[in-house]
Amino acid sequence: MQDILTVILAGGMGSRLSPLTDDRAKPAVPFGGKYRIIDFTLTNCLHSGLRKILVLTQYKSHSLQKHLRDGWSIFNPELGEYITSVPPQMRKGGKWYEGTADAIYHNLWLLERSEAKYVMVLSGDHIYRMDYAPMLEEHIANNAALTVACMDVNCKEAKAFGVMGIDEHHRVHSFVEKPQNPPHLPNDPERSLVSMGIYIFSMEVLQQALIEDADNDASSHDFGKDIIPKLIDTGSVFAYKFCGSKGRVDKDCYWRDVGTIDSFYQANMDLLEPIPPMNLYQKDWGIRTYEPQYPPARTVSSGSGNEGIFINSMISNGVINSGGSVQHSIVSSNVRINDSATIVDSIIFDDVEIGEGCQLVNCIIDKHVKVPPYTQIGLNRLEDAQRFKISENGIVVVPESYQF
């Protein structure tokens, strides 16, 4: 995989995920108790043999850059391997990135310097496991200008994605970004074929496409809206279907865009299913992250004699449960749960203390929050709405470092 450069787009604001993104980039949002969202894309790169990686950052990137430094400084520069965080360089003028394609256009000099033949473009804010090596093999075998990873979804969900039409040879003949009436599959009127935002370009094709797009004042400088539709006319754009038997990943067919509070919450809750739809336990595809060296989680009796209990939950290192009850929840590292506190259907980020007698239901508590004793969250929507953001599905979000 020496001939391919990987570019991860990690600079979006993620405003729909507010307040979790008020002080961090979306790819840096904690997920699954111990991970960050970007860890899943980076892990895919690691296990797929991709060793030249640029992470394009922009919006409130300090937390993301720190995570990359602490958890992902693992490649060997002497072998030409690297993961490099690239903030906006302003080499094309004093403007921020104006779209996904514009972000890479501003860094064309890095692509040229890499001497790679192919460029893989990935998003840093999706949750999935995928071996990219078979996709590159198909791209080369097809002599493709562009290969787009795709999957089929319900037509109602397809409105949020780029929808593709392909022939029997997987050649893409149509592409429309976020249509109100998505075209359905020929053999299934309820399903549409959508882009996953995973692309492999031949280097010269990408360079030329970005230069032409930058000169077009009418362009929104977006891959889905501008670059891909124009390349389809060349007849050299192919689809690669996700969720097959190719590659080393167990077939779990799980891919989620966690762009809203509700989708983020549900993706976390998916991990608590009796048989999770995404397998975190495949031994030869471990999800890498940075994790502080806390001692193992423990339960202990409280002064009143209550035993700390965990039921169908994911618990990270450093957690101490002193007589509280945690059910169907995800608890991140270094959390303290005090006597008679109950946590149900919730996500607790790092360094949180839950006071005695608290009742937390259907909520997300961001980092560095001390919840006072006997506080109730998720039980009274009117009271919660006066203090916190509540999602469409009723998930209450307590922001980072909130003071009660």
Curated annotation (Swiss-Prot):
- Which reaction is this enzyme known to catalyze? alpha-D-glucose 1-phosphate + ATP + H(+) = ADP-alpha-D-glucose + diphosphate
Listed InterPro entries? ADP-Glc_PPase (IPR011831), ADP_Glu_pyroP_CS (IPR005836), GlgC_bac (IPR023049), GlmU/GlgC-like_hexapep (IPR056818), NTP_transferase_dom (IPR005835), Nucleotide-diphossugar_trans (IPR029044), Trimer_LpxA-like_sf (IPR011004)
Concerning Gene3D superfamilies, the annotation shows:
Hexapeptide repeat proteins, Spore Coat Polysaccharide Biosynthesis Protein SpsA, Chain A
Note the superkingdom of the native organism.
Bacteria
Query: Which pathway does it serve?
Result: Glycan biosynthesis; glycogen biosynthesis
Does this entry carry the keyword Nucleotidyltransferase? yes
Question: Residues that bind alpha-D-glucose 1-phosphate, according to the entry?
Answer: 97, 162, 177-178, 195
From the Swiss-Prot or TrEMBL record, what is one GO molecular function term? Answer: glucose-1-phosphate adenylyltransferase activity
Extract one GO BP annotation from the record.
Answer: glycogen biosynthetic process
Q: What does this protein do?
A: Involved in the biosynthesis of ADP-glucose, a building block required for the elongation reactions to produce glycogen. Catalyzes the reaction between ATP and alpha-D-glucose 1-phosphate (G1P) to produce pyrophosphate and ADP-Glc.
| Quaternary data | Homotetramer.
Query: What HAMAP family does this protein map onto?
Result: GlgC (MF_00624)
Q: What is this protein called?
A: Glucose-1-phosphate adenylyltransferase 2
Source organism per entry reads Vibrio vulnificus (strain YJ016)
Lineage, broadest ranks? Bacteria, Pseudomonadati, Pseudomonadota, Gammaproteobacteria, Vibrionales
